[in-house]
């Protein structure tokens, strides 16, 4: 049921924090690599709410809705109304995919750029793992430490 609505999921390990230096209070840019799909990611995280350290492992998933039946999100939060995908995760952000790019070469790479209210994510890797995403798509990012 929930696995049908998840468009991407993998386990990541934090390699670096703020690789270009600290830019903002309460926000850390996380550089991480995935275990299974060999993806690379930069992700801005509100570390006052969800602290991360180098070496931490976490599951990251992306889905277009939090509703377990796959129905579109209404945009309204109704606490305790029903079980959602968010119940299985610790840190959730909602944003918009604003850029998709592909690079050709020996090993082709695709890149997704998503903005979560100004917190940015770059997800880079094999185009086969992220080809089903669409420009201007609204997404939920869900994280849980392992």
UniProtKB/Swiss-Prot annotation:
One of its GO terms (cellular component) is RNA polymerase II, core complex. The keyword Nucleus applies. Keywords: Nucleus. The keyword Nucleus applies. GO terms for biological process: DNA-templated transcription. It comes from Arabidopsis thaliana. Gene3D superfamilies: Nucleic acid-binding proteins (2.40.50.140). Belongs to the eukaryotic RPB8 RNA polymerase subunit family. Component of the RNA polymerase II, IV and V complexes. Associates with the mediator complex. DNA-dependent RNA polymerase catalyzes the transcription of DNA into RNA using the four ribonucleoside triphosphates as substrates. Component of RNA polymerase II which synthesizes mRNA precursors and many functional non-coding RNAs. Pol II is the central component of the basal RNA polymerase II transcription machinery. It is composed of mobile elements that move relative to each other. This is DNA-directed RNA polymerases II, IV and V subunit 8B. GO terms for molecular function: DNA-directed RNA polymerase activity. It is found in: Nucleus.
């Amino acid at each position: 049921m929930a696995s049908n609505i998840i468009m991407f999921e993998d386990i990541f390990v934090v390699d670096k924090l703020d690789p270009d230096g600290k830019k903002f209070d309460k926000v850390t840019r996380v550089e991480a690599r995935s275990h299974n799909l060999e993806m690379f990611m930069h992700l801005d995280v509100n570390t006052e709410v969800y602290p991360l350290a180098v070496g931490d492992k976490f599951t990251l998933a992306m889905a277009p809705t939090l509703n377990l039946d796959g129905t579109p999100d209404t945009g309204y939060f109704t606490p305790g109304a029903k079980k959602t995908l968010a119940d299985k995760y610790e840190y959730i952000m909602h944003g918009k995919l604003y850029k998709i790019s592909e690079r050709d070469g020996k090993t082709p790479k695709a890149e997704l750029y998503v903005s979560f209210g100004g917190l940015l994510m770059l997800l880079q890797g094999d185009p086969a793992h992220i080809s089903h995403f669409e420009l201007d798509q609204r997404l939920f990012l869900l994280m849980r430490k392992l």
